[in-house]
Amino acid sequence: MIGLLPTTAIFLATAPTDLRKAYDGLAVLVRQSLGQDPLSGSLYVFCNRRRDRIKILFWEEGGYWLCARRLEEGTFRWPQTEGACACYRREELLLLLGGIDLKQTQARKWYRRAAEKK
């Protein structure tokens, strides 16, 4: 995706969304339902009721980007959380888009060793 940095905030709308909406309709949902500013540079991810389509709205200098994905088979494993939106990390979004069920995955602890002294 364009401009997806590790520091970019990602918000998933937890309720099903009418994906006939385009730029302006989704921006209104971001303001009213999610309580966020659509011009902040964050990614806002929406899913339809059948969970086979996703739209991602984000603002980049000069205008909105709207990305869409439709699955030919199966569904996205959409999170069931309380509240209007869920905050995700970049890695979690990539797993979700790849069809991975995040409830059945577990992050492993990892670290880098300090440079060995010679």
PLM regions: where:
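Polybasic/polar functional segments that serve as interface/processing modules
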Residues: M1-K118
